[in-house]
Amino acid sequence: LKFVVLICLVIMASTSAQQCGDETCGAGTCCAVFSQNHCRRLSQMYDLCSDHSDASPSGNYLFFCPCEPGLHCDRNTWTCTEGSSRSE
């Protein structure tokens, strides 16, 4: 039984992690590319952000992470805000 629990934990950890250069990004973070790749926390209210659709094929973002759940990246100001994800 302990072995089954251990296998489940390993699977859960591997699905929530993202390889980012020499680091592995966990939940609540993304891989942001500057001169090198770095794990950064997801952008919060009024932080600068990238849109989820701006991820590279490898899942990395340029400079900033997308917003945390419940927020969206306003493409006019490039900051995380509440409300609809449509630009108006």
From Swiss-Prot:
Q: Which residues form the propeptide?
A: 86-88
Q: Where in the cell is it found?
A: Secreted
Q: Which GO terms describe its cellular component?
A: extracellular region
Cystine residue pairs: C20-C31, C25-C39, C30-C65, C49-C73, C67-C80
Give the UniProt tissue specificity note: Expressed by the venom gland.
Keywords, ordered alphabetically: Disulfide bond, Pyrrolidone carboxylic acid, Secreted, Signal
Which interval of the chain is the signal sequence?
1-17
Q: Which superkingdom does the taxonomy of this entry point to?
A: Eukaryota
PTM sites of type Pyrrolidone carboxylic acid: Q18
User: Which family does the similarity line name?
Assistant: Belongs to the MIT-like AcTx family.
Protein name (Swiss-Prot/TrEMBL): U1-hexatoxin-Iw1c
According to its UniProt entry, this protein's organism is Illawarra wisharti (Illawarra funnel-web spider)
What lineage is this protein's organism placed in? Eukaryota, Metazoa, Ecdysozoa, Arthropoda, Chelicerata
